[in-house]
Amino acid sequence: MIFFKNLLFFILVSTFTIIFFLFFGIILIFIRVFSSKTIAQKTLRFLIVCYGRIIIFGFARILVKVKFIDSSEGKQALDPCVYVANHSSASDAFLMGVLPGEFVQIVNLWPFKIPILGLCARLAGYLSIRSMSFVDFSKECKLLFSNNISIIGFPEGTRSVSSQMGKFHSTLFRIAKENNLKIVPLCILGNKDKPLRGSLKINPGNIEIHKLPAIDYNEYEHFSSFELKNYTRAKMQIFIDQHKEVI
């Protein structure tokens, strides 16, 4: 039964992806011709979020129930901010569609190699942290922040294989410090086998995305980037350890 549910899911998603981006691709070309690159990018980012939400809350319900939970305890962050999430599955990037506001995802090189979606990510201005120097990356981020656009990244860099997160890289935290921005930790629970690393099989179950209390600049201004990444990681790991029943 799980096999046939997976088969149905991939058939529906593949068909929907082709139709969705062909149809809206024509609209985007029209927008790009008669308006600015900025408007075209904003439109594409909005469409990518819509696409992700349809996948998450529509087709994925064949196998998985996804829930977004605000665990911020009133400590919210307005755009722009820096979202950081734990990373345990190839589905993590799609799950970011639950977030409000306009944002750009910070990714490794491999997502850009995915047919159709990779091209859309490039056109939407998503950034590959591996393909540019920190100086260039910082300039791109400052431009996004000036337009009230947040960034989202996975500071582990690679997927963890257990509930214990890997070491964090410092880049996103350097960016937050340079721009005096709030950091919003996101804890994704229940997705490590949706799918497992090296597999396309999605196992049935529940996924929760928790938005933790925002870390204000005043809270970390005296930290180095190294201290800040470890401070943030510790907060996230404590939360994950407290919710192991979901994992």
Each model region followed by its residue ranges:
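Short amphipathic alpha-helix with an adjacent loop that forms part of the alpha/beta core around
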Residues: S72-Q76, K142-N147
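Soluble, non-transmembrane catalytic domains of enzymes that act on hydrophobic metabolites at membranes
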Residues: M1, K5, I69, L228-A234, ...
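A short, acidic/glycine-rich surface segment
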Residues: S91-D92, F137, D193-G198
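A cross-family acyltransferase "interaction/gating" segment
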Residues: I116-G118, V161-E227
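Catalytic-site beta-strand/loop segments enriched in glycine and acidic/polar residues
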Residues: L144-L172
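Membrane-anchoring hydrophobic helices of lipid-metabolizing enzymes
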Residues: M1-C81
